[in-house]
Amino acid sequence: MEIKVRSLTNCEVAPDGGTISLGFEDVAGNAAAVSVSLNQVGALIMTLPGLLEAALKARYGDQSLRYAYPLSSWALEQSTDTTQRIITLETEDGFKVRFSIPKAEQSLLGEALTQPMPEVMVRPN
């Protein structure tokens, strides 16, 4: 069954942490919700950015487009695995994403960030 969503209304975590509920209003004005198990939430989160970028490219017919969030802050912390660190990237409105980074990649990332940016063509919106 396909449901066309007008707006997202609320998002909640079950008291036991086992599911996440996404509440919405459909185009007819009816309230509804989708409950996703904790096991499937990770798969959903990993899928959405790729779908968003594919939709953006399809809508505007431009394969160079990227959906990017403005970075407001970042933090590094040690993982329980001593060969890894965790980097948290955060936007001003509180969206966060975390990545674990092996030691070798940490150095490569640091070096890459210190290099001058290559010249690229900037196109106005």
Label every PLM stretch briefly:
Residues M1-N125:
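Positively charged, low-complexity terminal tracts
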